[in-house]
């Protein structure tokens, strides 16, 4: 069974794979995990913040050398690694 953080990191990897953006995202902040419970195959709510770098993915430049754009992501992940349930959406964080 995956830990909550591992499941979210997989979600960020999947987000990068499926993203139409030219740049990579990195996990910035992970909100509190749900209470430990029942079936690892049941989708769990998650909330986390990723930052998009301004560096293109093909350069493979270390993201920490790049400036960032920030997005807030919410959705669900499944902690059972054999079930690929992922429902994530991300929006630009509006500066106040």
Curated annotation (Swiss-Prot):
It holds the Pfam family Cathelicidins. SUPFAM superfamilies: Cystatin/monellin (SSF54403). Disulfide bonds join 55-66, 73-90. GO terms for biological process: antimicrobial humoral immune response mediated by antimicrobial peptide; defense response to Gram-negative bacterium; defense response to Gram-positive bacterium; innate immune response. One of its GO terms (cellular component) is extracellular space. It is found in: Secreted. Residues 31-50 are annotated as: Disordered. Transmembrane segments: none annotated. The modification Pyrrolidone carboxylic acid is found at residue 1. Probably a microbicidal peptide. PANTHER family: CATHELICIDIN, CATHELICIDIN ANTIMICROBIAL PEPTIDE. This is Cathelin. It comes from Sus scrofa.
């Amino acid at each position: 069974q995956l830990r909550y953080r591992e499941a979210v990191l997989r979600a960020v990897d999947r987000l990068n794979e499926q993203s139409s953006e030219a740049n990579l995202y990195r996990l910035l902040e992970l909100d509190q995990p749900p209470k430990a419970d029942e079936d690892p195959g049941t989708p769990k709510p998650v909330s986390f913040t990723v930052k998009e770098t301004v560096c293109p993915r093909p350069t493979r430049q270390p993201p920490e050398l790049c400036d960032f754009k920030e997005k807030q992501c919410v959705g669900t992940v499944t902690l059972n690694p054999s079930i690929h349930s992922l429902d994530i959406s991300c929006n630009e964080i509006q500066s106040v």
